[in-house]
């Protein structure tokens, strides 16, 4: 591909053309270079999971498994001018070993991915297959073992077979985990996650986001509730202390095909009674399930846990808008109409993040 970009500051527009230098193979696409780490500008991020793919006439779909997929895709195409980057957190085409389904998916999202960075995470339908080094010994990937996902999309991992990486995007740092490999304390992934969370400069990048496909945090999905843990087995037992110690603002998950948001949580307890606005000292992480991208919907438990603030059994996606270093807006929108059905704001200074609460500060002595 031939790439031409303005020599000005990052954030300028460029052009990408597929060619060999003499013959142009496809129409040119324009793109905007990303903001530098810490750059103070309007930054808008879309996050969702489990979208899948579909056809307008349904001619090649089995049982209409991802009925909301086209609505989500269409809505994001219509709204291209109002966001800057996309995070699709696992379960992309549900190809399950049929490579033609990857072609269908990439064609469906091409109007988005040709113009916006399209970041991806590994889900069970990309990676899982018995005896291949994954954490789950199931056949959800249809034998893909992560290879098509690693090949189709770029992500800045040191080892592309390990689908964990970080993204510095302006005032945000995203620590993207791989829930299909072992994340527990003592593993290489746990070491990466701690390094990713601990090395961010919160004065310049105040918005710290963790994401993974399976629910390593909290969900009132019926099958998690039946287990009594409201999480993937062993999901948060190791990671929770990292989210708490390093003050993760929002932890995102997919896998469960619906939407749910928690209150700010510390040790499974709500630490803020407000539901729509959070300010001052940062003392808990908000957990979001955004798995309603398009695949068949998942059910909730009948009893609503105290930490569950908002649930929606429908297809949708979320949007983060950072206005500056101290103001963040979160929105959840339905794919059917693009309207906002849940939202909250965060307003705080970086010193509110650094203030010691709970066990977030390391012990010190007079000598230190």
UniProtKB/Swiss-Prot annotation:
Mind listing the UniProt keywords for this protein, alphabetically? Chloroplast, Glycoprotein, Hydrolase, Plastid
Subcellular localization, as worded in the UniProt entry: Plastid, Chloroplast
Q: Which regions form coiled coils? A: none
Q: What EC identifiers does the entry list?
A: 3.-.-.-
Q: Mind telling me which SUPFAM superfamilies this protein's record contains? A: Metallo-dependent phosphatases (SSF56300)
Function of the molecule: Hydrolyzes pyrophosphate, phosphodiester and phosphosulfate linkages of nucleotide-sugars, sulfonucleotides and nucleoside di and triphosphates. Highest activity observed with the substrates ADP-glucose and adenosine 5'-phosphosulfate.
Q: Give the family from UniProt.
A: Belongs to the metallophosphoesterase superfamily.
Describe the subunit structure.
Monomer and homomer.
Name of this chain's protein: Nucleotide pyrophosphatase/phosphodiesterase
| Organism, scientific name | Hordeum vulgare (Barley)
Gene for this chain: npp
């Amino acid at each position: 591909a031939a790439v031409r970009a303005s020599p000005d500051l990052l954030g300028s527009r460029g052009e990408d053309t597929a060619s060999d230098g003499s013959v142009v193979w496809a129409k040119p696409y324009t793109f905007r270079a990303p903001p530098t780490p810490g750059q103070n500008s309007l930054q808008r991020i879309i996050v969702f999971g489990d979208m899948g793919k579909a056809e307008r006439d349904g001619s090649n779909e089995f049982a209409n498994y991802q009925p909301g997929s086209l609505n989500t895709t269409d809505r994001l195409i219509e709204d291209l001018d109002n966001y800057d980057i996309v995070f699709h957190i696992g379960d992309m085409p549900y190809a399950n070993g049929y490579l033609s389904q990857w072609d269908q998916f990439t064609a469906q999202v091409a109007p988005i991915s040709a113009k916006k960075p399209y970041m991806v995470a590994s889900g069970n339908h990309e990676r899982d297959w018995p005896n291949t080094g994954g954490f789950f010994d199931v056949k959800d990937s249809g034998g893909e073992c992560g290879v098509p996902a690693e090949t189709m999309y770029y992500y800045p991992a040191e080892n592309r077979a390990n689908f964990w990486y970080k993204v510095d995007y302006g005032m945000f740092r995203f620590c993207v985990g791989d829930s299909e490999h072992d994340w527990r304390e003592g593993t290489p992934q746990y070491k990466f996650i701690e390094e990713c969370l601990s090395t961010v400069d919160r004065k310049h990048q105040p918005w710290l986001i963790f994401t993974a496909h399976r629910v390593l945090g909290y969900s009132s999905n019926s099958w998690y509730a039946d287990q009594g843990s409201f999480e993937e087995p062993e999901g948060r037992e190791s990671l929770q202390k990292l989210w708490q110690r390093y003050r993760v603002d929002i932890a995102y998950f997919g896998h469960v095909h619906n939407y749910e948001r928690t209150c700010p949580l510390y040790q499974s307890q709500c630490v803020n009674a407000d539901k729509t606005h959070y300010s001052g000292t940062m003392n808990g992480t908000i957990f979001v399930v955004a798995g309603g991208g398009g695949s068949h919907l998942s059910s909730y438990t009948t009893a609503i846990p105290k930490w569950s603030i908002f649930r929606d059994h429908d297809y949708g996606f979320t949007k983060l808008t950072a206005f500056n270093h101290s103001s963040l807006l979160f929105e959840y929108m339905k794919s059917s109409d693009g309207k906002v059905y849940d939202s909250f704001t965060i307003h705080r200074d970086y010193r509110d993040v650094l203030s010691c609460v709970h066990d977030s500060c390391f012990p010190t002595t007079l000598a230190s």
